[in-house]
Amino acid sequence: MESDCQFLVAPPQPHMYYDTAAAAVDEAQFLRQMVAAADHHAAAAGRGGGDGDGGGGGGGGGERKRRFTEEQVRSLETTFHARRAKLEPREKAELARELGLQPRQVAIWFQNKRARWRSKQIEHDYAALRAQYDALHARVESLRQEKLALADQVDELRGKLNERQDQSGSCDGGGAEGDDDDKRNSVMNASSSGLVEEDYVSCLAVPVVDVSEDGSAACGGSSYEYDHHLDYLGGGQLPDPFCGMPDLWEIWPMVEWNAVA
């Protein structure tokens, strides 16, 4: 199994005491070694994995690095999806023994897989949030445009309403004057009709004149009251519309007047 792990680079050994600069240098060296090992592993994978087939060449050429088999990859994928958490050293050792790998191979594979999975998850979350942001931004812009359009409509309707109120105010002024004239005419007509009715009632209330033999007229009282009543009716004459009709006087029998004469 030692030949299978040639592409792996061990991390630097931890020290008990070292300063910050030394730690940074060690970390940089470790990263360069990891990058070089990854490049070497990718190149070996591109050329095709597996041990050298056929009897090529004496022991001079180095053995080709072997990749994980498909069965090993499937087992590792299944374990990773079932257990996203970090595996304990004992679990790593058992899984490595089942797959025929070293525990360090399993640990590094899980570490790389977890990093790629987190990166993809972050990209997925970012894409979802970006889509939501774009949708909200478009909605806000649409609402802003709709607000401006509604404000323009409100201004237009307010102007029309003011114009209509001005027109109705001018019309109401003329109409009020007309209404006052109509009311005045109605009052005058009512007054005149009331006077006519009062005259008619007064005419009907004139007592029957009793002409005595000596030519004096009695109205149920003195002649002064009768004359005063005639003066009230208009200069001692009966109202023309109802009591002053010539036809009625011509038809009225004047027996008593003739007898007196």
From Swiss-Prot:
- Organism, by scientific name, is Oryza sativa subsp. japonica
* Alphabetical list of CDD domains matching this protein: homeodomain
List the SMART domains hit by this protein, alphabetically: HOX
Q: Which SUPFAM superfamilies match?
A: Homeodomain-like (SSF46689)
**Compartments (UniProt record):** Nucleus
Predominant place of localization? nucleus
Q: Which family does it belong to?
A: Belongs to the HD-ZIP homeobox family. Class I subfamily.
Which protein are we looking at?
A: Homeobox-leucine zipper protein HOX24
